[in-house]
């Protein structure tokens, strides 16, 4: 196990290439299945949106919650063994989902899916931050998002194509994708260390939890993740309700993926000289919120897709900036622990978003208040944008200080 900064350039690039392949296959496999869980079990099986939202919330909370610990462990043993194990468990989870015939079995699949994701998510984020330099980090995150968008597009189209015949077949696609990642990562991913110090797992976690600025940033991000997770629960249901056709879910994800593929790399590159990371993050979250609110006013699939286009632009702006800032605010001597603690933002915000999103959607639908869920989702996002804008000077000073330190590490 070697320091990432000490790797020869060829090995560093190979590691980044493996991470891009991982992103493509993991997003493709995940989004071939997960968006259709709500459609399949709510519309085809007859479960309530709240019950399915609880399954997705458990998956979200357990995954990001366990990421805190695995991120800290990655500081000690390196990210590769954790990522490999996580991909293997995630593949098993989709096999369980394919055979699921009861609510308990679906919940078991969600728990396994969460544990698998918990083992690879923070270690993968730490590996990405360690293998990139501050100068090229945002560009890599933008490229990574574009690759992920391509995987999402292909995955959702394949899932929509197969969902009418057999949900189990769709789940098997997810299992194959993550099984392939396990093999690729085991063979080609270099073994690296992501921390420059000798912090123990628990001491690294204590540093992260006690860092008020880092924690404050991630608390504010919870509002963004609350909105973001509606892609897994409320948006597929809205597409089906508005159009009356399950295949419309693929159109929603197709628009989102198309924006990500075509603009996910180019738009941040065009704006990076005019806008810093924080203005781009705030603008992206605000635009996503506006797109969410507008969904409550539409009554046709074409208008829904336009709203998806707007909020997808917001996500294209916000996601690379959010990842860059999170990595920049993390201390290099406990990188995995910091990014693991940062994952709690998605665990809490996303978990609440999945469960309450399903509940609020049910309430809005039963009382003929279709605009209500989207007004709530968008308002929460706008509050997050306002909070981030207010504390921006403090975050920027810290980001600049740690970026200089990270530059020094890569140069030595």
Task: For the regions a language model picked out, list residue spans one by one.
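Cytoplasmic helix-loop-helix junction between adjacent transmembrane helices
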Residues: 110-149
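Structural signature of the two symmetry-related core transmembrane helices
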Residues: 81-95, 279-293
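Juxtamembrane intracellular "pre-TM" segments in multi-pass secondary transporters
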Residues: 1-13, 190-220, 408-412
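Residue-level signature of mid-helix packing/kink "hotspots" within the transmembrane helices
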Residues: 60-68, 152-153, 257-265, 350-351
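A membrane-interface helix-boundary motif in multi-pass transporters
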Residues: 163-176, 359-381
């Amino acid at each position: 196990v070697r320091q990432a900064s000490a790797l020869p350039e060829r090995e560093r690039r190979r590691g980044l290439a493996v991470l891009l392949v991982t992103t493509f296959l993991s997003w493709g496999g995940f989004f071939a299945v997960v968006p259709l869980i709500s459609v399949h079990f709510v519309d085809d099986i007859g479960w309530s949106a709240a019950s399915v939202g609880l399954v997705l919330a458990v998956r979200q909370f357990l995954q990001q919650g366990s990421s805190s610990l695995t991120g800290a462990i990655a500081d000690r043993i390196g990210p590769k063994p954790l990522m490999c194990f996580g991909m293997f468990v995630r593949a098993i989870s989709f096999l369980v989902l394919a055979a699921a015939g009861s609510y308990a079995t679906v919940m078991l699949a969600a728990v396994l899916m969460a544990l698998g994701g918990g083992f690879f998510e923070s270690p993968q984020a730490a590996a990405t931050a360690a293998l990139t330099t501050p100068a090229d980090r945002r560009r890599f995150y933008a490229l990574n998002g574009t690759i992920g968008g391509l995987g999402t597009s292909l995955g959702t189209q394949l899932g929509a194509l197969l969902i009418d015949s057999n949900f189990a077949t769709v789940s098997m696609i997810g299992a194959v994708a993550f099984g392939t990642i396990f093999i690729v990562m085991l063979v080609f991913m270099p073994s690296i260390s992501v921390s420059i110090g000798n912090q123990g797992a628990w001491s690294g976690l204590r540093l992260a939890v006690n860092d008020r600025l880092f924690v404050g940033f991630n608390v504010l991000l919870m509002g963004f993740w609350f909105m973001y997770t509606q892609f897994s629960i409320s948006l597929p249901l809205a597409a089906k309700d508005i159009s009356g056709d399950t295949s419309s879910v693929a159109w929603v994800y197709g628009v989102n993926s198309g924006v990500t593929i075509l603009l996910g790399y180019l738009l941040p590159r065009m704006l990076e000289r005019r806008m810093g990371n924080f203005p781009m993050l705030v603008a992206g979250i605000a635009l996503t919120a506006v797109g969410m609110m507008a969904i409550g006013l539409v009554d046709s699939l074409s208008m829904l897709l336009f709203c998806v286009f707007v909020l997808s632009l917001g996500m294209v702006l916000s996601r690379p900036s959010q990842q860059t800032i999170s990595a920049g605010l993390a201390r290099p001597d406990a990188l995995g622990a910091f990014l693991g603690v940062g994952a709690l933002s998605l665990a809490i915000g996303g978990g609440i978003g999945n469960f309450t999103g399903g509940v609020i959607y049910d309430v809005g639908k039963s009382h003929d208040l279709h605009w209500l869920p989207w007004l709530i989702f968008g308002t929460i996002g706008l509050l997050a944008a306002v909070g981030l804008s207010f504390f921006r000077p403090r975050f920027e000073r810290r980001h600049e200080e740690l970026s200089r330190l990270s530059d020094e590490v890569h140069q030595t």
